[in-house]
Amino acid sequence: MAALLLLLLVSAGVLLSSIEAQEAYSQLPDNYRKGVDLALQQLISHSGVRYHYLFFKSLLKSDIELGFDVGYIYHNFYLKATKCGKGTVDVTQCKFRDDRPLIDCAICYKTFAGEIEKEPKPYVHCLHKPALTEDMKTTRVDHCRTMSYQSGDSTILASKGSK
């Protein structure tokens, strides 16, 4: 009986964590959700990816609004594998896997009127967390800082973001 109760509690915890992650995603501002969606599209396009991934949590968010509906976004976040296969349409029942490492993603891009601009090309860098080195993290941030938009524009990481 105790084993059944334990199994029920663990199952409820897994379902709640999946629901909390979906809630965390839905609470992101729209301009950040579009970046997460872009990273997920690139991730599932790789043939080696077998599972569906969901947004897990934000590590760092930074944005600059320059006016005239132009903005620059930097977002560092985790994706987590689910037990659902790649290509799953209804992800509401997808429970997180705890046997796969998190994927650490950093993305920076320019927006105009709430849409991601094609130029300059958005930068998306996602890697399994254990493989991510401090040098790689520095390279990511440097790349986003030096993305050349137009002379005189602010850089993405010039503002102080929120965690």
Predicted regions located by residue number:
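Compact beta-sheet-dominated globular domain cores
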Residues: 85-163
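Short, flexible/disordered secondary-structure transition segments
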Residues: 8, 46-54, 91
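Short, non-transmembrane alpha-helical segments in secretory-pathway proteins
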Residues: 25-52
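N-terminal signal peptide
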Residues: 11-30
